[in-house]
A protein has these predicted regions:
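Donor-nucleotide binding loops and adjacent catalytic segments primarily
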Residues: 41-126, 160-163, 175-185
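Acidic, glycine-centered active-site loop in nucleotide-sugar glycosyltransferases
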Residues: 143, 160-172
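Short alpha-helical segment that forms part of, or immediately flanks, the ligand-binding pocket
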Residues: 118, 136-144, 164
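Active-site-proximal region of nucleotide-activated glycan assembly enzymes
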Residues: 1-40
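Short hydrophobic beta-strand element within catalytic cores of glycosyltransferases
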Residues: 129, 145-156
Length: 188
């Protein structure tokens, strides 16, 4: 779209891989924030279990779910008893995911979409996500530590640069889903 637009808005001042000829079209507006919503969130800690929220945004959550299934099978039962998973999952994976989680006797909630994202994020201890602009905005607003898997084929590699912003501010771990093995997870 860049060749055809007069200008475009960005959340971040720095836009990686933006061709020089389009930089004059960029208008930095910052992160979206609905003034009617309180952005001073009080973290509602789950006292009994750590809440892990897994969501892939509008695209790309299938690989997150598949990687999650690989990793969760390596976690001990004692550790799993201390965790609750809230998972946004594509409908086509619900049955497989639910079967695996039931077999592991895991505390979980699965939906294809959550309308109450701010409520969930206020209770979340760590998020496992993609790096779309909306997701990054949510993570920043909630000051939420995260493990981020940028969508590898995002245009201009923008998800990597979105994630790098949080990485540079020591707010996340960034993992490349194309170069993962279980040793990668154990180090994280």
């Amino acid at each position: 779209f860049l060749p055809f637009t007069r200008s475009f808005f960005t959340n971040f001042k720095e836009v990686g891989n933006l061709p020089e000829k389009y930089k004059k079209k960029k208008i930095h507006v910052g992160l979206p924030n609905n003034k009617r919503i309180n952005t001073n969130f009080t973290r509602k800690k789950n006292t009994s279990k750590k809440l892990i929220f897994i969501y892939g945004g509008s695209q790309g959550s299938e690989n997150l779910i598949n990687n999650f299934l690989l990793v969760i099978k390596t976690i001990s039962n004692n550790e799993l008893d201390q965790l609750k998973f809230v998972i946004q999952c594509p409908k086509k994976l619900n049955i497989i995911l639910e079967k695996n989680l039931k077999n592991l006797n895991v505390d979980y909630q699965i939906k294809t979409f959550f309308n109450d994202i701010d409520n969930i994020l206020s209770k979340t201890d760590i998020a496992i996500t993609r790096a779309g602009a909306g997701t990054i905005n949510d993570l920043i607003r909630h000051k939420l530590p995260s493990i981020i898997f940028p969508l590898p084929n995002s245009i201009y590699n923008h998800q990597y640069y979105n994630a790098k912003f949080l990485l540079d501010n020591k707010s996340c771990i960034v993992l490349d889903e194309n170069n993962l093995n279980l040793n990668t997870y154990s180090k994280s």
